[in-house]
From Swiss-Prot:
Enzyme Commission (EC) number: 2.7.7.7
Organism, scientific name: Pseudomonas paraeruginosa (strain DSM 24068 / PA7)
Name of the coding gene: dinB
Cofactor: Mg(2+)
Record note on cofactor: Binds 2 magnesium ions per subunit.
All copies of domain UmuC, residue ranges: 4-185
Complexes and interactors: Monomer.
Biological classification of the source: Bacteria, Pseudomonadati, Pseudomonadota, Gammaproteobacteria, Pseudomonadales
Pfam families in UniProt: IMS, IMS_C, IMS_HHH_1
Name of the protein this chain belongs to: DNA polymerase IV
Job description of the protein: Poorly processive, error-prone DNA polymerase involved in untargeted mutagenesis. Copies undamaged DNA at stalled replication forks, which arise in vivo from mismatched or misaligned primer ends. These misaligned primers can be extended by PolIV. Exhibits no 3'-5' exonuclease (proofreading) activity. May be involved in translesional synthesis, in conjunction with the beta clamp from PolIII.
Sites annotated Substrate discrimination: 13
Amino acid sequence: MRKIIHIDCDCFYAALEMRDDPSLRGKALAVGGSPDKRGVVATCSYEARAYGVRSAMAMRTALKLCPDLLVVRPRFDVYRAVSKQIHAIFRDYTELIEPLSLDEAYLDVSASPHFAGSATRIAQDIRRRVAEELRITVSAGVAPNKFLAKIASDWRKPDGLFVITPEQVDGFVAELPVAKLHGVGKVTAERLARMGIRTCADLRQGSKLSLVREFGSFGERLWSLAHGVDERPVEVDSRRQSVSVECTFDRDLPDLAACLEELPALLEELDGRLLRLDGSYRPDKPFVKLKFHDFTQTTLEQAGAGRDLDSYRQMLGQAFARGSRPVRLIGVGVRLLDLQGAHEQLRLF
């Protein structure tokens, strides 16, 4: 049985700003771009979240929700330096580390000799060292696989530790809302709810075949997750080729106008994912993906195109013209240039 730890820094960028400037502590704080230049929130303090402010939100919107919000420009050089320090701590316990972003990573400690192989004690020690050496907090989840470790790290945020033992997996997953499953967004969760499926226990009542018929290959993934199964390894050398966001709609979108209405929300989520990349990547070619009602699909990307709403609207229009029929799924994304540690800064757009 594997022992996986998921570590997630608590409001990482904001935490570092508050660490380095104590006058910001306890205040509604957002790190991000200027509201006058269509900036977005990279992250925010928990005080700001109480007002509804969240990552990837337009800064103008955030200021409407919280007029007293303090806006701080990001210092990516500081964030990257601290991220490297955190990873150096990780390497004292295992070399099997899969970074997900500057502030998040999976660790496989199955073969670690530290603390007699106790993943829980390793996670406790990592949290202690980060707090003492770097003066910020991290949350940790311990479980037999990546899917559950990630859920566990969020269970007692901020500054928390949650452990799911192999013996607890079945009961824990059974009570889990399907909205917690990786890949289940708002639309899919609502679709499942209309089928009478709200928890993983509900998912287990049906057959795998029925899920595949309803959701395609994702149905198989749903079935596995509902049973607490996730065989994905911790990928040490994993490098991203792209970042994207997709949404499958409960009802097919009948025309281009309906598709265009969905773009802003998708791009907002894409912005949030791009902001979490580390400095070894640079966004390059934007692309859109459409899956039509008959399950045929097309992808269109354009070198040199911008990553703004108008550019994606144009690409979406061109992609739609290839089929000119109802749309089941829209995806938006960006191909990445792998800089392997080059010191380039992501643009907050």
